[in-house]
């Protein structure tokens, strides 16, 4: 018996290449930044959600796509109104980190330590970095806006690593710390 799909996804073109977005009926569950090819991007989707189906986006997903496309074209979009579905696999601490990270406006940055303070765990800068390294919804949860205290980029787990992080910050006109 084949498992019923609980996620849908689609690819969409942006200024930096084809991104992918997955969703449930409750909200966006994942965003993937461009891989080398659309086939590689699809393969990443299926690694995370093996039973997902590619389909036309629901209205809230179309709204998310429009926001991501605009942001990646340099428009200062704050994507806090997009519903998210964390499912049951995202730990509570990570959710708190993601909630704080969503408040960082385009063109601005915070340090890992500043995010830790805002989640009420001032000594948890490394744990913040680990949570952001597992962020399943980049751009909507703008982990690229969180930097090391010394002004360095810190890490970035999306394709292209820190070069992609710097590209996203440049698109937004952000100044490094």
What are these regions (language model features)?
Residues 124-135:
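Regulatory, non-catalytic segments
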Residues 1-122, 171-177:
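Basic nucleic-acid-binding alpha-helical/helix-turn surface characteristic of O6-alkylguanine DNA
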Residues 149-177:
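…primarily DNA-binding HTH/wHTH and HhH modules…
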């Amino acid at each position: 018996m084949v498992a019923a799909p609980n996620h849908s996804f689609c690819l969409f073109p942006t200024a930096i290449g084809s991104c992918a977005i997955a969703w449930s009926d409750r909200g966006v569950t994942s965003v993937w930044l461009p891989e080398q090819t659309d086939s590689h991007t699809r393969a990443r989707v299926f690694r995370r959600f093996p039973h997902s189906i590619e389909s036309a986006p629901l209205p809230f997903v179309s709204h998310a796509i429009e926001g991501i496309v605009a942001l990646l074209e340099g428009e200062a979009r704050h994507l806090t109104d997009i519903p998210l579905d964390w499912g049951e696999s995202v730990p509570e601490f990570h959710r708190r980190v993601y909630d704080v990270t969503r408040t960082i406006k385009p063109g601005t940055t915070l340090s890992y330590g500043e995010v830790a303070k805002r989640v009420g765990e001032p000594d948890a800068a490394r744990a913040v970095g680990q949570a952001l390294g597992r962020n399943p919804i980049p751009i909507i949860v703008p982990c690229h806006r969180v930097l090391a205290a010394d002004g360095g980029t810190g890490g970035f787990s999306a394709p292209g690593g820190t070069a992609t992080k710097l590209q996203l910050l440049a698109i937004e006109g952000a100044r490094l710390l």
